[in-house]
From Swiss-Prot:
Species per Swiss-Prot/TrEMBL record: Arabidopsis thaliana
Tissues in which the protein is found: Highly expressed in roots. Expressed in vascular tissue of leaves, sepals and siliques.
Cell membrane keyword on record: yes
Upper taxonomic lineage: Eukaryota, Viridiplantae, Streptophyta, Embryophyta, Tracheophyta
Recorded family membership: Belongs to the major facilitator superfamily. Sugar transporter (TC 2.A.1.1) family.
Induction description: By wounding and insect feeding.
Bias-annotated ranges (Basic and acidic residues): 503-514, 530-539
Record protein name field: Polyol transporter 5
């Protein structure tokens, strides 16, 4: 047994630069790794749980309000409370996933959400319904944190952006399923329809829990447990080439503080390092400048993703369409299905652009489109609200700009938030750092969801969307200033990237020796560019 006891706060000095012969370089971009693709799909299916709840609640609220005779404040609390409850799961998920592994944490998320969905479907009153949402919220919190972390850790570098956008793809798929469920059960008796809408959400959680058992464990988690042999076998299956698998294993061992010359199948790893003691101190109390910048970037991108109002649009789209002039429940639910179709279609487009265009250009373009859409939506709703007669062109603009808003969100801000925040944290901080980002995401979403109806009454619905547009404008400036491009970077290279980033340098070149040869020609993140022997990177 070979022991390794690294300091928790200070990363080991970089290993000697590897000089890779040209003979090992692939002649063309690697083909998609189908095994890693399947693993990413199974892990990301956890996000269906949140998406379904958001989508189904948007329509179920109409019937819950009538059946249980509750007011708008109670409806807002019902809609937004799941996000607040999810904090428990998100806060616990980092430690849980380091303890039992990423895979069994996903199973746990599915089991908890299953119980919550059954309780909601059987709810006799408002209090019992809130209890069911409390249980489901914990499951959602676990799912939101663990899916992007697992996917980032199992994915080959050439397609990590593509694969790590899958959680957002499945959130959108879940929203779409929720909208369709609303439409399908809307004609049932009042007391039955909304309960079926909520209770049937237990079905995907069962499928998820069974499917996840076929997944391998994260290779990074295996290394943190000292199981190098198991990690190597997983990397051999999920990498684009044997050379990449070897180099990925060396990088992970280096980050975990395991000597490069250690080749045992099982080694002793410091318990403090593998289970997170000291991590919170490094994240919150005494962070290095690089870690501080990573924290600002991760928390900022999660905050602005939700503060720009996406969950208000998705949750309250029937109410928005009613304000825009669609009067019947059927018309409103059909329009929400259209929102789901647009949102899902554009997220699929985004998955193919992430590794071609890069995170930063796509994010800035997306948020710019959101600003324009929110301004037009706020203007059209204000005109409708102030006019005594129906202004048909304003109705058309309002409906169209809801669609353009969710489209521009889905092509950038939606998927990139999860991709970016899951790949920028160093290995030793990844679980806890990612869980903090999810906490901020869910708190912001909960506040927006709970306050949207009171805010709409206080400043009109159009005024609320002007406010969201202003926040999105601030978000664009923040992203331009503080978020470097991570395309073309190894996961273990993020410390160097954030140590040297300056906002004027959009290419985010790292500091270093200009004579330094790129150490890993096959694992450039999200890029098909291949480095030849002797190529250099300078600051």
């Amino acid at each position: 047994m070979t022991g390794a006891t690294p300091e928790n706060r200070t990363a080991p000095s970089p290993p000697p630069v590897k000089h890779v012969p040209e003979s090992v370089l692939p002649a063309k971009p690697p083909k998609r790794n189908n095994y890693a693709f399947a693993c990413a799909i199974l892990a990301s299916m956890t996000s269906i749980l949140l998406g379904y709840d958001i989508g189904v609640m948007s329509g179920a609220m109409i019937y819950i309000k009538r059946d249980l005779k509750i007011n708008d404040l109670q409806i807002g609390i019902l809609a937004g409370s799941l996000n607040i409850y999810s904090l428990i799961g998100s806060c616990a998920a980092g430690r849980t996933s380091d303890w039992i592994g990423r895979r069994y944490t996903i199973v746990l998320a599915g089991a908890i959400f299953f119980a919550g969905a059954i309780l909601m479907g059987l709810s006799p009153n408002y209090a019992f319904l809130m209890f069911g949402r409390f249980i489901a919220g914990i499951g959602v919190g676990y799912a939101l944190m663990i899916a992007p972390v697992y996917t980032a850790e199992v994915s080959p570098a050439s397609s990590r952006g593509f694969l790590n956008s899958f959680p957002e793809v499945f959130i959108n798929a879940g929203i779409m399923l929720g909208y369709v469920s609303n439409l399908a059960f809307s004609n049932l008796p009042l007391k039955v329809g909304w309960r079926l809408m909520l209770g049937i959400g237990a079905v995907p959680s069962v499928i998820l829990a069974i499917g996840v058992l076929a997944m391998p464990e994260s290779p990074r988690w295996l290394v943190m447990q000292g199981r190098l042999g198991d990690a190597k076998r997983v990397l051999d299956k999920t990498s684009d080439s044997p050379t990449e698998a070897t180099l990925r294993l060396e990088d992970i061992k280096h980050a975990a503080g395991i000597p490069a010359d250690c080749h045992d199948d099982v080694v002793q790893v410091s318990r403090r390092n593998s289970h997170g003691e000291g991590v919170w101190r490094e994240l919150l109390i005494r962070p290095t400048p690089a870690v501080r910048r990573v924290m600002i970037a991760a928390i900022g991108i999660h905050f602005f993703q939700q503060a720009s109002g996406i969950d208000a649009v998705v949750l309250f789209s029937p109410r928005i369409f009613k304000t825009a002039g669609l009067k019947t429940d059927h018309q409103q639910l059909l329009a929400t299905v259209a929102v789901g179709v647009v949102k899902t279609s554009f997220i699929l487009v985004a998955t193919f652009l992430l590794d071609r265009i890069g995170r930063r250009p796509l994010l800035l373009t997306s948020v710019g489109g959101m600003v324009l859409s929110l301004a037009a939506l706020g203007t059209s709703l204000t005109i409708i609200d102030q006019s005594e007669k129906k202004v048909m062109w304003a109705v058309v603009v309002a409906i169209a700009t809801v669609m353009t808003y969710v489209a521009t969100f889905s092509i950038g801000a939606g998927p990139i938030t999860w991709v970016y925040s899951s790949e920028i944290f160093p290995l030793r901080l990844r679980s806890q750092g990612s869980s903090m980002g999810v906490v901020v995401n869910r708190v912001t979403s909960g506040v927006i969801s709970i306050s949207f109806l009171p805010m709409s009454k206080a400043m009109t619905t159009g005024g609320a969307f002007y406010l969201f547009g202003g926040i999105a404008t601030v978000a664009w400036v923040f992203f331009y200033t503080f978020l470097p491009e991570t395309q073309g970077r190894m996961l273990e290279d993020m410390d160097e990237l954030f140590s040297g980033f300056r906002w004027r340098d959009s290419k985010s070149k790292p500091k270093g020796n200009p004579e330094k040869t790129v150490p890993n020609p096959e694992v450039e993140i999200g890029s098909n560019k291949q480095w030849k022997e002797g190529d250099t990177q300078s600051s």
